[in-house]
Amino acid sequence: MKNIIIILYLFIVFNCDKPDSLDVEIYKLDNGLTVMLNEDHNETSVFGAVVVDGGGKRDPSDATGIAHYLEHVLFKGTSKMGTIDYNTEKIYLDSIEVLYDKLASTEDDRRRLNIQKDINRVSVKAAEYAIPNEFDRLIEGMGGTGLNAGTGSDFIYYFNAFPSTQIEKWMEIYSHRFLDPVFRMFQAELEIVYEEKNRAMDNPFRVFYETFRKYFFKKHPYGQQTVLGSVDHLKNPSLSKMKEYYDKYYVANNMYLIIAGDFNKREVKRLIKEKFQKIKKGGTIEPVNILEKPFKGREVVDLVMTPYRMIRMGYRTVEPNHEDAVVLDVIQNMFNNSSRTGFLDRLTAENKILSAYATTGLGGTDLGGFGFQFVPKDDKQTFGEAEKLVLHEIDKVKTGNFDSELLDFIKLNINMSHETRMESVSGRLWLIMSIILDNKPWEDIKSYPEKINSVTKDQIIEVANKYFNDNYLIVRSDKGDHDKVKLEKPPFKPVAPKNTEAKSEYAS
């Protein structure tokens, strides 16, 4: 009876006609910028985002962290926004750029200190002309909420929500910020980035994860670089290299504009062309084509860096747009799911292991990976014993040791979660972003429930045996402290802009 109910539910919910609110129109402007529109009048607001195909993987190998740092700086305004007198301010900003480049090429500690003092002196002077947080105030002034940005390995995004009546103003402000950015308040933002990096380095679990990725991705920037950058590179930031990154990747043919919510497409298309056609077109951006070799059997790395013993295990799989990715999604939910009925969930519930979970998200656009993290139940349980327990659960999937009722329930769970995300504009916005990251058409998102429903037991067995083989990485951390490194802030005088209530030429 339970199976009949599940099948009937799936048929009714996922085979009915999809409303227009789930449609996404995708087209390109003449300059190559990709526009993605999702009109939904069930909402009273609009969500807007600009996405750049870049991220930490495209940081120069000698200047890691640049993409993330640039994301911070792009909130500081333009030659017309965020300044009371750009012509005078620019004299100091140009000097700061020269000094930072000089600092990056200087190794002598005494000379570095003198250069840092010069940077501080000129930065304090430049701050006399800056208007802090004017971009944020402009967005808030038009009723915008949720203003944020983020940098991942594969892309950078900027977004917020706003009233539908403010869509023209939003497009004007967002297009302007990318047309003519000025890299001001560099020292102040560097201090914020230092704080982020120090928090990350203080977190043993994050350090353990980044160390695992270093061994998992032995060549690709996914493992050999971090989004926040290395300590050495953050100590020697280069404004010139940041500008080079901006000039190369913040170009129309490498950017995406996403608008979802309560708007009229016909009216908005005219505004989009007017505002975003101005963004310059750049050269062809080549993909990061770095492949990883299979692991040679069971590769083991032993460390001491976490408050309690824990293990990460990883298998090479496929990129997100591969046909096996959907099957791997089902498999991941067979190990863990929100109803706590997965194979690894049961290990924890039966007190055989303290915690265990699986993830398909080890990689990104370029390369895939399926990971497991688990914690032995106590000090008596060895790493080997905990690993055997997890491998035994993996074998259940590989041998088909599960019934069809569990599989139907897993599919239902996945599809209900997907439908929940599709129902809201904010959830849909992130799904639209995901097709950029995963290099998929929107139709794949709409048809995802049908693809999940079509996954068979035989497919699960085949895919599990294809990827969960004898070649995998296992990184084990014994209980102990990791080596902590702290980024010390240079002996700078705080940069405190005076013009907190001023308005720029742009905002007036």
Model-derived features: positions:
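Sec-dependent signal peptide recognition
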Residues: M1-Y9
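Bacterial Sec-dependent signal peptides at the C-terminal "C-region" and cleavage site
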Residues: L8-S21
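Mature N-terminal segment immediately following signal peptide/propeptide cleavage
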Residues: K18-V52
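M16 family metallopeptidases and their MPP-like homologs
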Residues: N38, E43-G56, G65-I66, T83-H176, ...
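Active-site recognition of the HExxH zinc-binding catalytic motif
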Residues: T64-H72, K76
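An aromatic/glycine/proline-enriched structural segment found at the starts
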Residues: R177, P181, M201, K218-G223, ...
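Non-catalytic, conformational "gating/processing" segments within enzyme and secreted inhibitor domains
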Residues: Q187-E191, K197, F205, Y209, ...
